[in-house]
Amino acid sequence: AGIVLDKLSFAIANWNRSQACTKTKQLLSKFNTNIELILANNDEMAIGAIQALTETGIAKEQWPIVIGIDGTEDGLEQVKEGNMIGTVYNDGIKQADAIADLSIALAKNESLDSFNLKNGRYIRSPYQKVTIENVDDYLKLLQ
């Protein structure tokens, strides 16, 4: 099931747009248009990859699919412009609410059963897929 991919390479860009741009240019010089997909662990690095694609003059229709994570305003704008196929929204508000609720429960020495802690320690706040179809909804959340 799914699509079989060959991993051509990887690069570490330390969550940094500029480093991601440099690393992507290096990968493009090595693999040219054989790169079909760029998965970045945050939107900043995805945007750095987009910057490299733009600066190297590759025609947009030849770009690989670019996906980021975090759903930052800049990342959402890249999705809206069609430069990234998607990002994954990291809901900081839900995370903050969960931390506050947990802190209050701990301070009051209340049961933590309702928090459904994973491994007795973690609260999972699900990420949300953002694509061109729903990007405007997420941009509104950031206003």
Regions found by a protein language model. Give the residues of each.
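Hinge/cleft segment of the Venus flytrap/periplasmic-binding protein
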Residues: D97-Q143
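Residue-level recognition of the N-termini of beta-strands and the immediately preceding loop/turn
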Residues: L5-L8, N34-L37, Q62-I65, G120
